Each structure stands twice: as structure tokens, then as C-alpha cells.
A protein has these predicted regions:
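Conserved HGGG/HGGXW glycine-rich cap/lid loop of the alpha/beta-hydrolase fold
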Residues: 40, 45-94
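Conserved loop-alpha-helix segment in the C-terminal half of the alpha/beta-hydrolase fold
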Residues: 246-285
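Flexible "cap/lid" loop of the alpha/beta hydrolase fold
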Residues: 146-185
Length: 306
């Protein structure tokens, strides 16, 4: 595995080893929002008025990850903030059973239909990007356009040896081991030093790292374990040609790994089969690009939202 692939693997998977239950209340968004709507697999709050923009966070991440963009975005848009049950200290709800990703998609579609949000702009970070692609596949009318933030149609390519075409069947046994190992950490304490070690590489800025660690420590490791497993065995590569909604792939790079020269070709290869895709890169950032470079991310997001 080369250094670029290794760093991406760390960015996507490293938080999963540190997640502990710490049931409490999730932090409010930075803009005035409506009351929370609880569903089987997700909860939703809203802010602002205008054309709808749906924001889906990544693995073990609360809706607060979007705090830096919500106030500006809500000036012209109806911002729908999604949070997966079991993250941010929330009750896991139905997410202790298999089928979490499909359940999230089902809940999102129900919310979109009920609230007449068809054709919304959808933004997903990491796991949220995979969910966005799943939603576009299952309910193409729900999405008018899709922004994918540092995510892939098949996460397991990050674990593939050079020259090997990995498949979900090949990954499933290792993914199951990882799921069971992470789920077994539920209720067990972890030191700050271990948490810092496991989250290394996910963000570059000290403030970003502090926020990320605090969020990760509140996630229910049982939910995270199941979502990790489903992430790793979900392969949407063959579905990309059928996704007609325009896709914007936003990816980070930095002076270490991945460099700009490495990142661009990698992401273009992963999304080559998509019929309508554009690319936006943001430098001096890691996986949590919205935390490392909030101004640049907001600029890219508002340009996407229109």
C-alpha cells in the first residue's frame, strides 16, 4: 500500500478504533434551527429559507461539523442538517441492527418526500458522501445535484494491495472482524493519548483535531462498528453511470500526503464512470477539510449550492 493510499485509509477508518459511548446532548448548530425531527435511523433539524440543501456528516460525526457554513448558507437556502442516530451521544434507535445505511437512505427519502424537497442539493462528507450516492441510485428524483466531500464509491479500494481488484466478498471477512472488534469497545475507557494517536491524520489544524476528538468520543461504537462494516462492503462503482445528477467531488491535499499531484489522479480514477462530474480541490487540509479550511470550503459549498 503506498503512502497516499495509507493516509486515505487512516482518514476514512482511523476514528473507528476510538469511539466510546458518552450519552449526552448534541451541540446546537451555529444558526437558529427548527426543532429536531427524530426518525428510526436519523434526526433532522433545519435552518434558513430558500432552495433546499441537505448536509450529511460522516462516520461518528455530528451535524455540528457544518457549524462553520450553516449561518452563511442559511441566508439563501433551507438547510437540512442530518445526524445519524448513535452519533453525538444520541440514542442509537434502530441503528443497532444491520442495514443502517439503507435505513438512512429510506429515512432521507421519506423526509424529502414529506417536506416536498425533491431535487435538493445534497452534500455528504465521507460516509455521508456514500449515502448521497446511495440516495441518488435508489431515489434519483430526490437529488438535483450532489457534492461528495472526500468520499469514494467503494471505500475498500483503500485496503487493496497494488494490482489487486478488490471485491466486497474479498473484504467482508476482514470487515466483519473489524466490526466485532470495534463493537466490543463499547463502554470501555480510552486515554487521551490513545485517542490522539488513532485520530492522527484526520485533520491538520489544532482546533480541528480538538473538535474531531471530542465528537468521536461521543459516538456509540456499536453503531460505528456496523456502519464501518457496511461502508466497506458497499460497492457503488458499477452504479456511477446511472447517477444522472451532476456530481461535484471535493477533495483535500497538503504538503505531506496526499499531495495535490497524488490526489487529483486518484479521485478522477474513482469517479471516471460518472457521466457528469466535476472536481474541486482544497489545499492545506486533511479529511475534515471543512474544519481545516473553513473559508475555502464555504466558498466551494456556496458556489455549489447556487
Amino acid at each position: 500500500m503506498n503512502h497516499f493510499t495509507l493516509r486515505l485509509a487512516v482518514a476514512v477508518l482511523a476514528p473507528l478504533a476510538i469511539l466510546q459511548p458518552n450519552i449526552g446532548h448534541c451541540a446546537p448548530t451555529a444558526a437558529t434551527s427548527t426543532g429536531e425531527v427524530r426518525m428510526d435511523h436519523i434526526s433532522v433539524t433545519e435552518a434558513g429559507k430558500g432552495s433546499p440543501v441537505i448536509l450529511i456528516p460522516g462516520l461518528a460525526t455530528p451535524r455540528a461539523v457544518w457549524d462553520g457554513v450553516v449561518p452563511e448558507l442559511a441566508k439563501n437556502h433551507r438547510v437540512i442538517l442530518v445526524q445519524v442516530n448513535g452519533f453525538a451521544g444520541d440514542d442509537p434507535g434502530a441503528n443497532l441492527k444491520p442495514g443502517v445505511l439503507d435505513g438512512i437512505v429510506t429515512d432521507l427519502d421519506a423526509y424529502i418526500v414529506k417536506n416536498k424537497l425533491t431535487g435538493a442539493a445534497v452534500v455528504g462528507h465521507s460516509m455521508g458522501g456514500l449515502v448521497g450516492m446511495m440516495l441518488a441510485k435508489a431515489h434519483p428524483g430526490d437529488i438535483g445535484k450532489l457534492m461528495i466531500v472526500d468520499s469514494l464509491p467503494f471505500f475498500a479500494v483503500l485496503r487493496a494491495p497494488p494490482g489487486v481488484e478488490v471485491t466486497p466478498a474479498m473484504v467482508a471477512p476482514q470487515a466483519a472482524v473489524a466490526r466485532d472488534k470495534i463493537a466490543a469497545t463499547y463502554g470501555k475507557p480510552m486515554s487521551d493519548a490513545d485517542a490522539a494517536s488513532q485520530t492522527k491524520g484526520l485533520a491538520l489544524k489544532p482546533d480541528s483535531i480538538t473538535k474531531m476528538k471530542a465528537w468521536a468520543m461521543k459516538a456509540d461504537s456499536r453503531v460505528t462498528a456496523e456502519v464501518l462494516y457496511e461502508d466497506l462492503i458497499t460497492d457503488l462503482r458499477s452504479d456511477l453511470p446511472s447517477i444522472k445528477a451532476p456530481i461535484t467531488v471535493l477533495y483535500p491535499w497538503n504538503s505531506g500526503y496526499p499531495t495535490r499531484e497524488m490526489a487529483g489522479p486518484f479521485y478522477r480514477k474513482q469517479y471516471a464512470a460518472a457521466p457528469n462530474v466535476t472536481y474541486v480541490d482544497i489545499g492545506d487540509a486533511a479529511h475534515f477539510v471543512m474544519l481545516d479550511q473553513p473559508d475555502a470550503f464555504l466558498k466551494a459549498l456556496t458556489a455549489f449550492a447556487g
